[in-house]
Each structure stands twice: as structure tokens, then as C-alpha cells.
């Protein structure tokens, strides 16, 4: 999910020395515009997920079906993986519109999978966790955007840490260790806080060299990566701040 497809390098603009425009200023302006599209698309994806999730949670028939058919949940999980793989691997070979539709389809499927959280946790604690997540995500994304430090080494470390987190999570499905679960939750928060900054910096760097015909594609893959950072950070924070209805 973090193997981003890098768009073809920007082939440079034909700036005349006598032109009134400043190349550096133009690049900064274009990068800012692309990042706005990334954040907008990510936000729309989150809204799709929230709407679908609340709608499904409000359907007793859907929740009953999901509770009695575990294969359905795993089917949603597999569908999410397939959609992410298709978007990442085929990004440059599909139209910008197709990539956007697949992204929103992924957001919708994820909303269906996340519906149970509205049954397990109170609405107040979900809202509180969301605002904590939004504030944390926003702060780290701003840091990743404006920092002059190269986050590549940190990002690479976090990527491998993420793999370790996934393995530990699978192991804990069988061991059901409370202590390991707590460690996993803490590590998950730290990893996705860091990945938010790293992904933001990567997207900004890619935006500086993206040709006009690939801007829409970059907005989609950038939105997907930040969307995943936000959702995962939210879910790990929910383990700490979520209040059970029981």
C-alpha cells in the first residue's frame, strides 16, 4: 500500500529569460495546487467512508448478516487489498477518472468493513477520537510539508516497522495477548504518525516533477496514501479513546 507509483518526470518548462514569470515561483504555486487536490480528494474519500459506514451500521439486517457470515468481512478485506493493488500498479495505465472511481470504490468498501465500530463504541468516543486523529494527522502532515529535513531514512524504517506490526497483529489473533495488543496499539499510533509526515513529503516532492497530464493521477495516489494513514491512525487511537457500549 505504500509502494507508490511515481509519475514520469517533469520534462521542464520552456521559460524564456525575458519572461515575467519566475520558474521557482511557478513550481511552488503548482505544487501547492496539487497538494490542495490531494487533500480535497482524501477528505472526500473519508466522507464516503463515514457515510457508508454509518448507513450500514444503521441497518440491523446488514449488521446481522455481517455478524453471522465471517466470510463476508474477509471478502471486503480482500476487495480492499485488490483495489489498492490495482490503483498502485495500474495508475499510469488508466485514466484519471478511472483511478478516482477506484479510489472512491475503495473508500466505500472500507466504510462497509468499518460499520461495526459504530455498534461497538459510543458515538461520543468515536467523535472525540476523530478530532484527536484529525489534529494529530494535520500537525504531522504540515510538518512533512514544510520541513527541510529529508525523511527518507525515517520513512524506510517506518515501512519495515509497519511490516513487523502486521506480523505481530496476525500473531496476536491467535495468542490474544493483552500485553502484546497494547504494544501493537502504541506502535501503530507512532508508525502512522510518522508515515503521515513521510507520505506528505513524498507527495510534495513528486508534485514538483509531475507533468500536467499526470496531476490527476498523483492526486489520487497521494489521497490514497494519506487516507490510509488517517484511517489506520484513527483505528489505533480508537483503542485508547474509544468507550465500549457494553
For the regions a language model picked out, list residue spans one by one.
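A hydrophobic alpha-helical transmembrane-helix feature that marks the membrane cores
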Residues: 1-246
Amino acid at each position: 500500500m505504500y509502494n507508490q507509483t511515481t509519475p514520469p518526470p517533469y520534462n521542464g518548462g520552456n521559460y524564456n529569460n525575458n519572461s515575467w514569470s519566475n520558474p521557482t515561483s511557478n513550481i511552488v504555486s503548482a505544487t501547492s495546487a496539487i497538494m490542495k487536490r490531494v487533500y480535497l480528494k482524501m477528505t472526500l474519500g473519508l466522507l464516503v467512508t463515514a457515510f457508508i459506514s454509518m448507513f450500514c451500521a444503521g441497518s440491523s439486517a446488514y449488521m446481522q448478516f455481517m455478524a453471522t457470515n465471517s466470510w463476508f468481512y474477509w471478502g471486503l478485506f480482500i476487495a480492499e487489498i485488490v483495489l489498492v493493488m490495482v490503483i498502485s500498479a495500474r495508475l499510469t495505465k488508466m485514466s484519471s477518472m478511472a483511478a478516482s472511481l477506484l479510489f472512491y470504490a475503495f473508500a466505500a468498501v472500507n466504510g462497509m468493513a468499518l460499520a461495526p465500530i459504530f455498534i461497538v463504541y459510543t458515538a461520543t468516543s468515536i467523535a472525540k477520537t476523530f478530532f484527536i486523529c484529525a489534529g494529530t494527522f494535520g500537525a504531522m502532515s504540515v510538518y512533512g510539508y514544510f520541513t527541510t529535513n529529508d525523511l527518507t531514512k525515517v520513512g524506510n524504517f517506518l515501512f519495515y516497522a509497519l511490516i513487523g506490526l502486521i506480523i505481530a497483529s496476525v500473531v496476536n489473533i491467535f495468542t490474544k495477548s493483552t500485553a502484546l495488543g497494547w504494544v501493537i496499539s502504541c506502535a501503530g499510533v507512532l508508525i502512522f504518525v510518522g508515515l503521515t509526515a513521510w507520505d506528505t513529503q513524498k507527495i510534495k516532492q513528486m508534485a514538483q516533477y509531475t507533468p500536467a497530464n499526470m496531476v490527476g493521477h498523483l492526486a489520487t495516489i497521494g489521497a490514497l496514501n494519506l487516507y490510509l494513514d488517517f484511517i489506520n491512525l484513527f483505528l489505533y487511537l480508537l483503542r485508547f479513546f474509544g468507550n465500549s457500549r457494553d
